[in-house]
């Protein structure tokens, strides 16, 4: 019994060895005796496979044909479904990286630093521009509650996006060496999520704010005079203007509308990558987004400077909605005259009661 079992095991082992030997011999003969010009499975799947095999024999370690095929951006096979999911490597990504790191970041940083430096130098030279006349104590409504609410919505969301964007754009250069990798990674992730959620709110607020102030921002002839004299910033010369001067109108049309819409549109392309846009479109959107944002921050720096420490009483207009008559007469003479004639369209503050017959359309408020 034991002899028969031992004999069977021996025969099985012998036949198994012969089978694997024959299989290996056939594979070797098939590889060495393949007809000239015949394509192997690998060469059919990857046309550069034979080229890579030859390159490995001539220059071991040189896998240039493989990477040439990878960088060709040809669509191959993947179980993932999506735009460009079959493209292993997109060559435009390196071009985008070089433009972002070697052009946008250095130039944007220099431009922002230059504008902030110019504001600081101007303040050191000119200081806060005080009223030439004493305040009268009679206050005029310049902005109603809705106008101020929309302005502050845009201001707060813009400031949030600006700070978070600056961290993501310049943080690797400025913050990382100071706070270390762990804290910087946490801060950058927080800024990215904050940026993504606040961005759409800013976009909507920009549109509402544009139509809120559109009526009083149409260009007029006297705006050319204001621009020629630079609003009296360098000469102390009185230059009349309407409810908004030419400088504020430039900020409205170029900064709020032009750059604001550009930043919003490009940001939405980046924020929602599930609308069939490819990587090339998102790389272009990123370049446009960064460039437009830097320009908008530069213009906003001038706007914020003039509205806070640059001009006395300007911040009160957006804080309380009211300005002194002396301020209105000195900075917006034409609007003041219309106001006093009862032709201004400034609404009455809520809760002040009906306007008496014959009174100006915009009500005054005693300090």
For each feature predicted by the language model, list its residue ranges.
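Hydrophobic secretory-pathway targeting helix
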Residues: 1-32
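Membrane-embedded alpha-helical bundles that constitute the cytochrome b-like, heme-associated redox core
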Residues: 2-5, 29-367
